[in-house]
Design a protein with these regions (language model features):
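A short beta-strand-loop structural module common to alpha/beta enzyme folds
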Residues: 38-50
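Glycine-rich, phosphate-binding/catalytic loops in enzymes
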Residues: 37-40, 106-108
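Anionic-ligand binding patches
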Residues: 2-19, 58-175
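Cofactor-binding loop segments of dinucleotide-utilizing enzymes, especially the Rossmann-like FAD-
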Residues: 24, 44, 134
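N-terminal beta1-alpha1 ligand-phosphate binding loop
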Residues: 6-38
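Surface-exposed, flexible loop/turn segments at secondary-structure boundaries
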Residues: 27, 47-49, 137
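Short, charged, surface-exposed secondary-structure boundary motifs
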Residues: 49-56, 116
Length: 175
């Protein structure tokens, strides 16, 4: 490549905003990589449990999809204010089961209990994604998936947890 062509290519790359994933989620990283998206990862420092608890206490945004959307916006906005030229992706999920919202399990006992509670039952996963640039959200989307978890034994859960390992603690469904 000639010096002129190299300069033009470098200039074009410098003008193209980068894509930043505001998440530590291995699953989200895998999705972007498998789609061939070039990105950097800068996890947001949002305390999801505190935000969720505050919303419930105030009696606002108690619908799981709304909470997931607010968390996705909060994460993307936080990271995009520090990298204003980047297109920042924030995402979150909330799981609705019966009349309550479940969060990521805090340990393996909580994961075991959650899986045993979900087995043989239907639950709804609310997924939200937000794109931000310069601290402003430019696009959001929320979708839901209604899922039926098959019935299984407590022994199966034990084997599953030993094989899946700590990854179950990064998912609201422990799966």
């Amino acid at each position: 490549m000639t010096d002129v062509a190299s300069s033009i290519a470098a200039g074009m790359q410098a003008q193209t905003p980068g894509v930043v994933l505001a998440s530590a989620s291995p699953a989200r990283v895998a999705v972007l990589r498998s789609a061939g998206v070039a990105f950097t990862q800068k996890p947001a420092s949002v305390d999801e449990r505190s935000v969720h608890a505050a919303l419930q206490k105030e009696g606002e945004l108690t619908l799981p999809g709304d909470i997931a959307e607010l968390l996705a916006i909060t994460k993307a906005t936080e990271v995009s204010t520090g990298d204003p030229d980047a297109l920042v992706i924030g995402a979150d999920q909330m799981l609705a089961f019966e009349d309550r919202t479940l969060e990521k399990p805090v340990d393996f006992d909580a994961a075991r209990n959650q899986l045993l509670e979900l087995r043989g039952n239907t639950h709804v996963l609310h997924s939200a994604v937000c794109l931000c640039r310069g601290g402003q959200h430019v696009w959001t989307h929320v979708d839901t998936a209604t899922m039926m978890m098959r019935d299984f034994s407590p022994e199966f859960v034990g084997r599953y947890l030993s094989v899946a390992g700590a990854s179950v603690l990064t998912s609201v469904g422990a799966y």
